[in-house]
Amino acid sequence: MENNSSVLDSDIVKVDKYEPHKIANGKNEVTFFVASDEIDFADLQRYRIQAQTDYLIAISTTNKYYDCLGLADNVISCSTDEVPLVMQAFQRLHSGSGIIGMSWDEVKWAISGNKNIEFLHGVAGGENCVTFACEQFISKLQRLSSNYPIKNVMINMFADISFGCEQQDFIIKQIDKNLMVKDATTFYQLSFFDEFADWKSGERGCCVCMFLIYDDKSNDSLIKHI
């Protein structure tokens, strides 16, 4: 597996979420929407055009196929409670807030032409937070099923300021050991948070977020989410 760590772009990449009848406030490089039968096609298209959206990304929280998924450039599968984290982790892949990370051009390269994306994460606080966070997302990783090979992987690590190279290397080794793929390009991002959902200021914490991008050439499959 190839690992890529690059200098982040200084350009601001705007990521926003579509809501019914929302008025765009400038250009969005990425617009997210949560897939459902309630999506108004015409209004979604209006917002996409108004926001000059480069990538319209659907978030699917069920195994059901919704007609609105046909409008999306990409579909990220996750559980309902992961929706806010999906958007946060995706935006911070190229936010310039991390030590290592991706440029916006690399994010576009990773997702372009590959519609289906699976989101996994593990999070923990306390003394052994890195180990526990890894155990969480690896157990999910081992239960995945898809008819298509993994083409690219984007990983975002959120951690408190005590996080160092040793912990980072541990996570990377665990991923290399358990993600059995060939010819996949893997990108890493590391961002520090004094406070996060699972830890307060002064506490230790780690959240590992993974976007698995499938080589789904037919662009018609849905990933069976666990």
Question: Model-derived features: where do they sit?
Answer:
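Tubulin/FtsZ superfamily GTPase core signature
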Residues: M1-I226
